[in-house]
Amino acid sequence: MSRWAGIVLAGGMSSRFGEPKALASWQGSTFIEHILKEMTSALQEVVVISHSDIKERVEQFVQVPVIEDIPHYKGNGPLAGIVSGMEYIEADWYAIMPCDAPNVSHEWFTILLEQTSNEYDAVVPIINGRKQPLFAAYHNRVKEKIYALLQEEKRSMGQLLSQCNVKYVAGEDVQANTDWFINVNTKEEYVQAQKDLSNE
């Protein structure tokens, strides 16, 4: 059993972005390729959770397994994706990543996993005053809590965190760069992120 594993939530077509964000171009590759490069350098095993409408396209770009949500919970948002990844890879801890944060660094996963300890169910960063539950780490034991929530048709990450013993970590306390957590949700944000990158 791996001690640590990674789960990338690739989703599917994005209505706000106009195309699958996972496959958006970034620094000569794609969002998903960049994220996986950073994750796989820090974690033993990584799996991508993808919507069926883009699964085959994602598989062409990556060298890790690409799976869909467990059929019974398909389309139930991030909780369904996380629990599907937990079922696919057996590990103690899982680092989660959305597919729309292409600035992330392998350093983040090292920092995150250094913060884990058995007394906690989750380690969640607070960046610029906001909780970031999709850039977090979750212990294997959280799986049963997620199933219970999905059975009750509860889908929010906040509902999961309210049931967990969470260690909240302020980004500035662990030398985390706030740029690592920038989400790209629209084409305007995409253009801005590319400009910011070229100005560095």
Curated annotation (Swiss-Prot):
GO terms for molecular function: GTP binding; metal ion binding; molybdenum cofactor guanylyltransferase activity. Keywords: Cytoplasm, GTP-binding, Magnesium, Metal-binding, Molybdenum cofactor biosynthesis, Nucleotide-binding, Transferase. GTP binds at L9, A10, G11, K21, D69, D100. One of its GO terms (biological process) is Mo-molybdopterin cofactor biosynthetic process. Disulfide bonds: none annotated. It is found in: Cytoplasm. Its cofactor is Mg(2+). Mg(2+) binds at D100. InterPro entries: MobA-like_NTP_Trfase, Molybde_CF_guanTrfase, Nucleotide-diphossugar_trans. It is an enzyme of class 2 (transferase). One of its GO terms (cellular component) is cytoplasm. It catalyses: Mo-molybdopterin + GTP + H(+) = Mo-molybdopterin guanine dinucleotide + diphosphate. Its EC number is 2.7.7.77. Belongs to the MobA family. Transfers a GMP moiety from GTP to Mo-molybdopterin (Mo-MPT) cofactor (Moco or molybdenum cofactor) to form Mo-molybdopterin guanine dinucleotide (Mo-MGD) cofactor. The N-terminal domain determines nucleotide recognition and specific binding, while the C-terminal domain determines the specific binding to the target protein. This is Probable molybdenum cofactor guanylyltransferase. The gene is mobA.
